[in-house]
A protein has these predicted regions:
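Conserved phosphotransfer cores of two-component systems
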Residues: 42-44, 66-73, 94
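Conserved phosphotransfer microenvironments
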Residues: 47-67
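A short, hydrophobic beta-strand element within the central beta-sheet of small alpha/beta folds
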Residues: 73-83
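C-terminal output helix
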Residues: 104-113
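Alpha4 helix (beta4-alpha4-beta5 surface) of REC/receiver domains from two-component response regulators
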Residues: 62, 82-98
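Two-component/phosphorelay signaling modules centered on CheY-like receiver
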Residues: 10-29
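The C-terminal output helix
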Residues: 114-121
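Acidic, metal-coordinating helix/loop segments flanking the phosphotransfer/catalytic sites
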Residues: 32-48
Length: 121
């Protein structure tokens, strides 16, 4: 079964993302901290990571490599209000697969996730 890790320091954001994706057939794993996210990704097979924490990628800790230690290599979607060219470019250069600007239409996130899974087939 597909596994999606939803990471956010805020429980209400994790719940909101989970609710928006309720029609996607997948096992959802919540992660509240960066260390929890890295642990989950290194100990279980996950297809997709969705996070709203831009800082963890930009702090020099090589979070993308830590998330992608195992197989399969999960796609990483980042949700953020920061639309600066520097932030978006840095995230993409670090290996983030999708940058989704907030606020967003719920359909947009569902479409991005559905598209990701169609590509896997």
């Amino acid at each position: 079964m597909r596994k999606i890790v939803i990471h956010s320091p805020r429980a209400e954001v994790r719940a909101l993302i989970r609710g928006l994706l309720s029609d996607i057939e997948a096992y959802f794993v919540p992660a509240a901290t960066r260390s929890e996210l890295v642990r989950i990704c290194s100990t279980t097979k996950c297809d997709l990571v969705i996070t709203d924490d831009v800082r963890m990628f930009l702090n020099g800790s090589d979070t993308v490599a830590q998330i992608r230690k195992g197989e399969p290599l999960p796609q990483i979607f980042v949700l953020s209000h920061d639309l600066s060219e520097e932030a978006v470019t840095a995230l993409l250069e670090l290996g983030v697969n999708q940058f989704i600007s907030l606020p967003m239409a719920p359909e947009r996130l569902r479409a991005k996730v559905a598209s990701h899974y169609r590509e896997l087939v």
